[in-house]
């Protein structure tokens, strides 16, 4: 709506009425090309610029149609209208050089041109002979236009285009010129793809992603090509519904078979290209080199890790070795310190013992007669063996600082305490031995050995034989029984059954009872090998300090040290036994020699017992 401008300042607006005739209402109809363009845009809901582009496109297509040159088909007039299905429809319309690329406008224009040229009326007017009805070749032009103007029928004909090359290059053909051979093949087969933007084959410079995308596309190729045009039977010609269904079934089966053959052809094409593609070989070599590099890097990393672990292990071993050496050094120092303390203790005890003997000798052993003196000397030796260092020091201090009567009283008191202690120990040992014997007899009841008495000597001999013939000895218990029968002083003959029963009863004893048995055996040994007192009329000899024979039983550790020393110092070694005694702490040369003789006797007895059992078994056989 148009409005007049307002009046200027200081001026007014005047309204005038023109003296004209009355208005009349008339109808106006819009016409012209601009109105036509407006209506098209309104109907298509498009802008003016979009419509302008459409117009340009139509103009370009019209210009192409005007520039299109139709090819003359020389065999057109010789075509049989009844065999129209086997004709080349594009060639009939003069589009043989354009074929599937021809647009609908071009097909329409070509048909129009062919009609103007070959219509029967026009040819008849020109004096040419005309066949009646559908027998004229013009029918072929009509059929060609019917097939190509219908998109469905045209697609069916394009699928079986007689000019299309369905051949697949072999591997030998593309060995040297792969891209020149396969590029046009993939290019012409790309027309069957349902998907647009079909990837190109590329060249040697194509990336792995492009090549992979290309082969992925063709291995999953989606083709629209179908073969309904080659149906042998037309369902429209069927006389009934059943016949039509049968025809459709036959046509579907034939189409499926041809579709399968087509997909096999495409797959063969892709397989041949893939096997001949030099880029695939290059990518495989690169992948192989990459994997080898990764494998080498992994191996290097593993080797470095192993080297680090080995280095750490060696460091740990070195640290453990140093710690062990340090610990061994500490143990050795402690052992040396303990040995020094023990030596100091021994020297102190030895000194106190000698002091006690000298003090008693000074007081003439507090006796007036020789018999009392000898007895007192034995008691003093007993004190020296039984008393500890502190008791010896206290007794020596008392004897040094007191008179003869006080010293004698102190000495006699100490002797009385020691004798009382020995008596109690002896009674306890005898009681334990009696109890052990009773327990052994009870546990061995029914074992065949209850009626045979086992003396202390036989028990010690049994223990010795069990240690002498360890487990694993052939006919062990027979050998032990034979050994006891040979060396026993009781005269009682033992069988293997008796020995087994007694050995089991001894194993059931508590540790205190075993200690009592061993101690009693040691006391007996000491008694048998002890010093015999001289006669009363004999002159007492002067006592000299020297190494005395140690009657303490040999421990397992001392036995190992002795065996090692015997191996270390052979028979031809000078001062052999002195060196062996030095290698066994706490043992003298005499102790080592005596122990060696005992071992030799034990080995001989063991061999003799084994030989006797062996001879007895041979005699039975």
Curated annotation (Swiss-Prot):
Protein keywords: Acetylation, Activator, Chaperone, Chromatin regulator, Cytoplasm, Nucleus, Phosphoprotein, Repeat, Transcription, Transcription regulation
Record Gene3D superfamilies: DnaJ domain, Homeodomain-like, Ribosome-associated complex head domain
Primary location group: nucleus
Post-translational modification: Phosphorylated in M (mitotic) phase.
GO BP terms in the entry: 'de novo' cotranslational protein folding; positive regulation of DNA-templated transcription; regulation of translational fidelity
Domain J, first and last residues per copy: 88-161
Location of region: Disordered: 294-315, 426-453
Pfam families hit by this protein: DnaJ, Myb_DNA-binding, RAC_head, ZUO1-like_ZHD
Descriptive protein name: DnaJ homolog subfamily C member 2
Organism field: Bos taurus
